[in-house]
Regions:
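Extracellular/luminal recognition modules and glycoprotein regions
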Residues: 9-63, 128, 138-177, 185
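Structured domain cores in non-transmembrane regions
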Residues: 42-108
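Low-complexity intrinsically disordered segments
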Residues: 83-217
Length: 218
């Protein structure tokens, strides 16, 4: 039996359990414009199939064609999935969002207090279809795990990585590289404009004026 909801609990009270990655799929669903929705499907029983991959690379959610209770699990929002790093929940600070850049989708873990997002999964976008989904492939080191509370399995999956958050941020920052402003180097002070005096101009000022003295020679 999977527990579905729990009150807010300390991040250290949950454990996790490895899952068979072949029985899960991470999907992106087009919801309008360049916006995408993240969902995870899990195959509990072998048949019928909860999803099928189409020849064009998109994924059909076949679980919509039958009563999938006890056969498939769906994880549709932050109640069903979150981020786990180095054995700790970090859902209190990170949010999972799908970003589109031209023909590429990336699942990002975003923390408003940090400027560099962590890439969790990605995919090349074959095409956009409202009734079919795009499969996202987890980046190296990332796996889906089950949330465990006092030995009981919960209806919640983790996007989990063994490295701590600070190391993941450092790797993401190194991969992103220096910004264009940093590559330009420190700005230099502008040179002062050249001083030019017109032939018939008069110089006004205080104090003596040094004059060029030419010695007289008879």
């Amino acid at each position: 039996t999977l527990l579905t909801t729990l009150p807010a609990i300390s991040k250290t009270i949950f454990n996790s359990q490895p899952l068979n990655q072949e029985r899960l799929v991470v999907l992106a669903q087009a919801v309008g414009g360049n916006r995408w929705k993240l969902l995870v499907l899990e195959q509990i029983k072998p048949r019928p199939l909860c999803w099928e991959t189409r020849p064009d690379g998109l994924v059909n959610p076949t679980l919509n064609n039958f009563n999938f209770a006890g056969i498939c699990n769906r994880y549709l929002d932050s109640n069903g999935y979150s981020l786990r790093s180095s054995g700790e929940d970090v859902a209190h600070s990170f949010r999972l969002r799908i970003k589109q850049s031209r023909d590429r989708l990336e699942l990002k873990a975003l923390d408003p207090a940090r400027s560099v997002p962590i890439t969790v999964a990605s995919a090349i976008l074959p095409q956009r279809h409202r009734d079919a989904f795009v499969k996202l492939n987890l980046e190296p080191g990332w796996k889906l795990e089950r949330r465990i509370y006092q030995g009981r399995k919960l209806s919640h999956v983790y996007f989990a990585h063994p490295d701590p958050v600070n190391l993941l941020i450092a790797k993401a920052s190194a991969h992103q590289g220096p910004s264009a402003f940093k590559q330009l180097g420190a700005p230099k002070a502008p040179l002062p404009p050249p001083i030019s005096i017109a032939k018939n101009s008069v110089i006004h000022g205080k104090g003596p004026i040094r004059l060029l003295v030419i010695p007289y020679r008879p």
